[in-house]
Each structure stands twice: as structure tokens, then as C-alpha cells.
Amino acid sequence: IPVNDMENGWVYWSNWFGLDAVTSNIQVQRGLGASKIAIPSVGGTMNILTKGTRNKAGGTVKQSVGSFGKLRTSLGYNSGKLKNGWGYTLAGSYKRGNGFVDETWSEGFFYYAKIQKELGNHILSFSAMGAPQKHGQRSYKSDIATYDTTFARSLGDTSDFSERIVNKGISFNKHWGYLDRWILDSNGDTIHNREVLNTKQNYYHKPQFSLRDFWTINENFYVSNILYASIGNGGGTGLSGNTNNYDATGQYNLQEAYNANSNNIDALYSLDENKAGTYLRSSINNHFWYGGLSTLNYQFSDEISLSGGLDLRYYKGEHYREVYDLLGADYALDAANGLQDSEIKKLGEKVGYHNDGIVKWSGAFSQMEYSNGIVSAFLNISGSNSAYKRIDYFRKKDLVLADTTYIEALGTSVATELEFDNDGNLIGANKTMIEDTVWHNGTAYTMNSDEAKLA
């Protein structure tokens, strides 16, 4: 089952960190070579095989302890082959740690379950696994002097460090700070709620489900069919608004942001709710991915084998930002959505961008392989076809007519309404959204017209 991200090709090992508890063996190929996939990887491939009815019954219990609070507990059990050809495999794991870098804590769980049934020449199996996790982060690709100017100087960096923060050590992380989420109760008393908050956090959960049929037609002919689905949900947080508010020690001044947000009425938008000058947003990357794999292998002799297969995939990735933490405010402002009816955004509402990436992928391969123990050679013929579509829900819609197209012409625009008294003095104002209107051949079109299409 392929696990490389369908949009960028990356592999996120944290999505199945506890799989070692039920791993039977790992097949590793370095560089281009004979491999039963539609598009052989130039860099190489890795295939992880889990335990099943063909393996011995047994279990493992493992406790790992490491530096910086690293702790991991793992359990795994494989039943082997039971009566009537049944078998099952179970695994679970929990990990946590503080991290070498300040406030880069981590916590994660892993679960795995597989049930198998031998039915004649078939082995049927269903499996499910996932690893919900979250961890603190810091920005990367920064020079050493960002953390420790003395250490950078010892390595030969002759840059001007006069504007740098005082030496904090290479474990320094500027993205966290102390925060007291105080509130006033009905009696006017201050209720304190103190915490340490890392503004850069990552959280994700990508469960995967598969249904497999391994069919041994005879001792020379083998067919495998797999259906699978994967559902990913999660994202990473960061600051929005005033992103350059650091104190003398280099930490982000969260308390100052919270205090300002807690008393920030903007009459243009609300008379009784506080507007956020700084808040946390989360960049979300959800996806739904399903596919099917069918491969066959025929052994002509001890030296010659033929294999081939089909690989079909459908992937939909949903990408957007949302308001994650208002830091004492009631709402934030965002004007990125060209179709919105209000710039006011509450907790959990989308900001910044919102688009879908849809990938349809198909591939096929055939391979002849020769090996006599001294010389090995293979001939591989493969091909694939992919289609990508991007849908942007924040861009204004196109007006598509029979004789012309107006690009990104229909959505909403901001209007400011001013209020004056009888003497002409300005006494108030408020922001509103109005629908864009395009007139064509005497007909008015808006974003709700049938002819309005997403970009």
C-alpha cells in the first residue's frame, strides 16, 4: 500500500510510529531496481510486512526510556494460525517526551488490528491502524546565531551580531511564552489561569484501513488484490497579526497580546465584543484517499519470473486555515475570502485560504526478472497517468456566459457605512459586505447565479 503523500511525495513516519511491534520483516531496495510498483523509485523503495497467520504465535512488551523525558510503552501480539484458519494481530503504543529544544514536547498513541482467515488457497485479511499525535515545534532553517551567537562565533561566523538576542543556547525556541488567561467574574474579581503555551504546534491523525486477498493459484502462480482507504485530519498552528512582539529575552510576549485582546472594542465591527490584534491560526491539511492494487507473479523456473499489476488511486486534499486560539478576544478579522458575507471570524472559522486538491492516478507495470545467484537482470515496462484539479473556495467566482467569461468577477466586497447627525457630524460607522453585480446584455449576475463558477 503506498504511503507517500499524493501531493508532495513526502513520507510522514509519525503516522505509524508503533508499527515495529508487529513487523515481520522490512524489504529495502537502494536505487533503481526490480520492484513490483507502477513507477519504480529512482532513490529506492521500502516495504514493511506485518505478522499474520504464517508467523508464530507470540507477543512483545517493551518499555523504552530516553533523555529529555522520552518514554515509550509498546505492546504487540500475534495469534498465529488458529482453528479453522483464523488469526489476528494486535498492537498498541504510547509515547511522550519533553524534547531537547525548549517546549518541543511530544505525545502520541498508536493502534493496530488485523484479522485474517485462510479460505482454501486464499488468505483474506482486514486491517486498521492509526497514530494520533501532537508535538511542539520551532521554526527551522535558521542560522546558529539565532540561538547562540557565541557558539556561532566559535564556528567561524564573522557576521554582525549586535542586533541579536542574548545567547540562549542551541535549545532556544522563541515561539513559546508564559500566559495567564485571566477573566473577571461577576463580582469583578480576577480569576487566574496560568500556562506555558507554544504557538507552533502540530497535530495529526491518519487512520488507514485495508482489505486484502492473497490467492495462491498453484506453486508457481500468485495473485494479490488490495483495497484501502486513508483519512487524514490535522494541522499546524502559528501566529497571525502582530508576529514580531518579542520581549528582551527573545520569547514571544503572549501576555501582552492577551491583555490587549481582552480590551479591544472596535465599533466598526462590534460594540460589545473584543477584536483580536494577535491570535493563533491553524493550517489544516485534511485528506481522503482510497485506492486499489492488483498484482500477479508467475514463476516460470527457478531463474525466470514474470510479474505485473495495476495501481488505481483517488485523493482529495482539503487545505485551509482556521482560527485556533483567539488569545482573549471574541473574534478576528480576515478579508481573504472573496465570497464571504462577513470579515468577522470566530473560533474554528476559516481564514487565509481554502482550497481542495484532487488527484486521480492510475498506473500499470509488467516485469520480467532473471536471476541465477550470480547474475541478475530485469526488464520493466511501466506507465502511469495522473490528473490534478484545484478548487479555490476563497477566490471570487468566474462568470461563464455563452459569448464571454468574466474572470473572478463575482463575490462580495467591503463597504463602510457612515452615520451623520442632522448637523452633518460623523457619529458612527460600520462595515458591511455587499454582493458584486455584473450586468451583461441587460441581465444582472451575482455569485449566486447559475453562471457563476468556482475558480
Predicted features by range, described:
Residues W105-F110, K141-F151, G156-T158, S240-L254, ...:
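Flexible, surface-exposed loop regions and adjacent strand-edge segments
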Residues S35, T45-K81, A91-D102:
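Short strand-turn segments of transmembrane beta-barrel domains in outer membranes
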Residues Q63-G69, S79-K81, Y94-N98, L119-N121, ...:
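Transmembrane beta-strands of outer-membrane beta-barrel pores
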Residues S307-A455:
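Signature of Gram-negative outer-membrane beta-barrel scaffolds
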Residues P2-R30, L49, S154:
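Short acidic/polar hinge/loop motifs at secondary-structure boundaries
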Residues L124-S210, T237-R281, G338-K345, D421-G424:
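Acidic/polar loop-and-plug regions of large Gram-negative outer-membrane beta-barrel proteins
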